From Swiss-Prot:
InterPro entries: DUF520 (IPR007551), UPF0234-like_C (IPR035571), UPF0234_N (IPR035570), YajQ-like_sf (IPR036183). The keyword Ribosomal protein does not apply. NCBIfam families: PRK05412.1. GO terms for cellular component: cytosol. This is Nucleotide-binding protein Ping_2261. It comes from the Bacteria. It comes from Psychromonas ingrahamii (strain DSM 17664 / CCUG 51855 / 37). GO terms for molecular function: nucleotide binding.
Length: 160
């Protein structure tokens, strides 16, 4: 029986490249001259810091555009609330990987509500979808791509 997996993964090298490109662009921007602003990443957690909250928002937009340029979906970003300590504003952004329990339940409910002729099984942080026909699996793929969930999904391990 044909099957495929629904996963949510981030290419960490592309994530690092996007942060490096954002840092390069930050160094050349006129509105950030003479301003203490930084952008760093460690273990899939980005840390933004700037002197004003408006500059922090600009850093966030800068990171988001560079992520999109590098092919990393910006829906994987999970920003925390900005923190103001002394003279600097900091914001920590975590990147979501894996399909968590509530999201997998939403996906299963979505597939069941559309009466697709497939079976869905949760396997850790991914979902395995099996069906009798390849067309049913492709219909599930287009259904998931068309929904607005807070996470980016990839389809891999397609077996016939």
């Amino acid at each position: 029986m044909p099957s495929f997996d629904i996963v949510s993964e981030i290419d960490t090298s592309e994530l690092q490249n996007a942060v490096d490109n954002a840092n390069r662009e930050l160094a050349t921007r006129f509105d950030f001259r003479g301003v203490k602003a930084s952008l760093s990443i460690t273990n899939d957690v980005a840390k933004l810091s700037a002197e004003h909250d408006s500059q922090l928002r600009q850093l966030m937009d800068l990171l988001r555009t560079n992520l999109i340029k590098r092919g990393v979906d910006s829906r994987a970003m999970d920003p925390e609330t900005p923190n103001h300590t002394g003279k600097t504003w900091t914001q920590v952004i975590k990147f979501k990987e894996g399909v968590d329990q509530p999201t997998s339940k939403k996906l299963i409910k979505l597939i069941k509500d559309n009466k697709m002729k497939v079976q869905v099984a949760v396997q850790g942080e991914q979902l395995r979808v099996t069906g009798k026909k390849r067309d049913d699996l492709q219909a599930v793929m287009t259904l998931i791509k068309g929904t607005e969930l807070d996470q980016a999904f990839q389809f891999n391990n397609f077996r016939d």
